[in-house]
UniProtKB/Swiss-Prot annotation:
One of its GO terms (molecular function) is DNA-binding transcription factor activity, RNA polymerase II-specific. It is found in: Nucleus. This is T-box transcription factor TBX22. SUPFAM superfamilies: p53-like transcription factors. It comes from Homo sapiens.
Length: 520
């Protein structure tokens, strides 16, 4: 029965084949197992012979255990011949420098900035290699490869990196960075620390400066390659890593996530703290104490203000030499703490009960009284006296330019001991403006009316019998007199129980200068 062409196509004969064709294929199929057995036996003999030949040198070599800090990978056995085999068989070790800092970053989650122009890594990859042949030449290179094919995002509320999706790294051509010292002898490589601090990361896919091209928000890890120099390979001319004769090392703690701006604030603080090139971002107030200490060593001081709330004050009657830093009851005055030798505050005021100036009425005519005081740095606790000119000399004076200044010695502003002199003739008193202290190492500071620091022909260092300290300079300070001093209603109590009031016309405020210059 004849079959149609369509039925013949689906027949058993068409699917299985004719018997004549099957008979011709049978002897070929019968010969194939015999050939397979022969080839398998020859391969087994070759393997046994090669294993027997390599067994002796392998027994003599020490067993190499994988390093805990680095993982090594080797290229294929072909290409470099004996040189590649020797490189692979050698126990080459590589140690990461600064591993503690890398681990600290890794615990938080290392982030690396990438920019169009290229950004250097911090921390940078720095390694130390051992086990190289001192006489051979080696290249050392580094590349950065993705850890996985995931894209990440930073979750701020949990401070963690989360997977945001998959990505494709095939669009980026992998690059590697050859160390500038390559090629170099194994002895030189083992003697120095190999640093890749000049390598830069970029996200510019069109970069032509040799930077490592990466994608943002991805995880990468750097790998360090040790390549033995061969005559057929010139790493300075090629742009990709050779696949033969290479030993590769990588470190778990050097993994990082690429970002265009730091996401974790802890990473930002740690990089600012540890990166010497980030000092511009540090808090300038940390060095403020050191700068203040340097400024304190200079001889100048900032301007200060004297606040005379009330000019009158009470002192112990009949005791002209009593210190005003102690009150009548014997308790220490607030001035004692304000004017201690160790306290040089730029702002202070004199309380009411601590500024006592016992003097007779005749010593305060209607004249201008410029005020000077003297600090004696060597006699800290010695109370210096105050001696005023004779009343006749003060009464005959009409202007402040012909008056001797009212001198008051203050030992380091620790006390204000003031006395008056009732004995002696007017001629002696007119020439004696100030009792000379026992100290010879002194300095004069003045509160003077506008003009010269000392009145001409009124007082000289020889008349004072004191020498000026060579390390001090004169500086000028201005402050205004308070209104309470001008129109105050308080009185000055003197030793003979008499009172002098500004309102009685003894010291008319018209003759007082509204401002007094403080020369320091």
């Amino acid at each position: 029965m004849a079959l149609s062409s369509r039925a013949r196509a689906f027949s058993v004969e068409a699917l299985v084949g004719r018997p004549s064709k099957r008979k011709l294929q049978d002897p070929i199929q019968a010969e194939q197992p015999e050939l397979r057995e022969k080839k398998g036996g020859e391969e087994e003999e070759e393997r046994r012979s090669s294993a027997a030949g390599k067994s002796e040198p392998l027994e003599k070599q020490p067993k190499t255990e994988p390093s805990t800090s680095a993982s090594s990978g080797c290229g294929s056995d072909s290409g470099y011949g004996n040189s590649s085999e020797s490189l692979e068989e050698k126990d080459i070790q590589m140690e990461l420098q600064g591993s503690e800092l890398w681990k600290r970053f890794h615990d938080i989650g290392t982030e690396m900035i990438i920019t169009k122009a290229g950004r250097r890594m911090f921390p940078s990859v720095r390694v130390k290699v051992k086990g190289l042949d001192p006489g051979k030449q080696y290249h050392v290179a580094i590349d950065v490869v993705p850890v996985d094919s995931k894209r990440y995002r930073y979750v701020y509320h949990s401070s963690q990196w989360m997977v945001a999706g998959n990505t494709d790294h095939l669009c980026i051509i992998p690059r590697f960075y050859v160390h500038p010292d390559s090629p170099c002898s194994g002895e030189t490589w083992m003697r120095q620390i190999i640093s890749f601090d000049r390598m830069k990361l970029t996200n510019n896919e069109m970069d032509d400066k040799g930077h490592i091209i990466l994608q943002s928000m991805h995880k990468y890890k750097p790998r360090v390659h040790v390549i033995e120099q061969g005559s057929s390979v010139d790493l300075s001319q090629i742009q990709s890593l050779p696949t033969e004769g290479v030993k590769t090392f990588s470190f778990k703690e050097t993994e990082f996530t690429t970002v265009t701006a730091y996401q974790n604030q802890q990473i930002t603080k740690l990089k600012i703290e540890r990166n010497p090139f980030a000092k511009g971002f540090r808090d300038t107030g940390r060095n403020r104490g050191v700068l203040d200490g340097l400024l304190e060593t200079y001889p100048w001081r900032p301007s200060f203000t004297l606040d005379f709330k009330t000019f009158g004050a009470d002192t112990q009657s009949g005791s002209s030499g009593s210190s005003p830093v102690t009150s009548s009851g014997g308790a220490p005055s607030p001035l004692n703490s304000l004017l201690s030798p160790l306290c040089f505050s730029p702002m202070f005021h004199l309380p009411t009960s601590s500024l006592g100036m016992p003097c007779p009425e005749a010593y305060l005519p209607n004249v201008n009284l410029p005020l000077c005081y003297k600090i004696c740095p060597t006699n800290f606790w010695q109370q210096q006296p105050l001696v005023l000119p004779a009343p006749e000399r003060l009464a005959s004076s009409n202007s402040s330019q012909s008056l001797a200044p009212l001198m008051m010695e203050v030992p380091m502003l620790s006390s204000l001991g003031v006395t008056n002199s009732k004995s002696g003739s007017s001629e002696d008193s007119s020439d004696q403006y100030l009792q000379a202290p026992n100290s010879t190492n002194q300095m004069l500071y003045g509160l003077q009316s506008p003009g010269n620091i000392f009145l001409p022909n009124s007082i000289t260092p020889e008349a004072l019998s004191c020498s000026f300290h060579p390390s001090y300079d004169f500086y000028r300070y201005n402050f205004s007199m308070p209104s309470r001093l001008i129109s105050g209603s308080n009185h000055l109590k003197v030793n003979d129980d008499s009172q002098v009031s500004f309102g009685e016309g003894k010291c008319n405020h018209v003759h007082w200068y509204p401002a007094i210059n403080h020369y320091l």
